Amino acid sequence: MAKLKYTVGDVSAIRRSIAEGGDVWYNKKLAGVKKNIKKHFKDKCLRCCYCQRSFKGEFDLVIDIEHILPQSLYAKCMFSPKNLSIACKRCNMKIKKASVKFIVDGYHKKRIFNKSTYKFIHPNLDAYNKHITRINIELENLSITKYVVKNNSQKGFYTYRFFRLFDFECQDFDLAQGLPIIERYI
């Protein structure tokens, strides 16, 4: 998939918004830019960059443009394509918020977009499927969802815990058979 590229109009809107100051991301001049960003990432992968839940058939309102490095702390990275993706409201607003706990201690500021700077699976620097496999099977009203960390990946384990992926793991088939639910926490 091609990298996110801004149009001349996008760059102009971004510059005007920054020049006006204030809360730049919420400037109305950026509506078209945000639409283009969201479209780019939806075309790339119609899933949350953290939990991999599908956005297929979802309205744009439930899909957030995600700033991997929070815009409140890393304003200079606000429009950097490496710092943008799409995420579900749960992962973006409920869990991650403006946290930076996922950045390794002692990282070099000039290497902020180096994958070794991040404890979790970075949406643009890492390949999710090299760290975690998400298995989801649905049959009528029953479903099974399981996240499997591959090759003892530390990024996989961190992502699993940080984004509470175990909350999504369903064992409806066990319930249907009257079997007890087994604790899934790592």
Which residues make up each language-model segment?
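Extended charged
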Residues: 1-41, 54-58, 75-85, 89, ...
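Long, hydrophobic/aromatic-enriched structural stretches that serve as scaffold segments
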Residues: 52-54, 63
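Histidine-centered catalytic micro-motifs used for acid/base chemistry in nuclease
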Residues: 65-70
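Residues immediately within or flanking Cys/His clusters that coordinate Zn2+
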Residues: 45, 62, 85
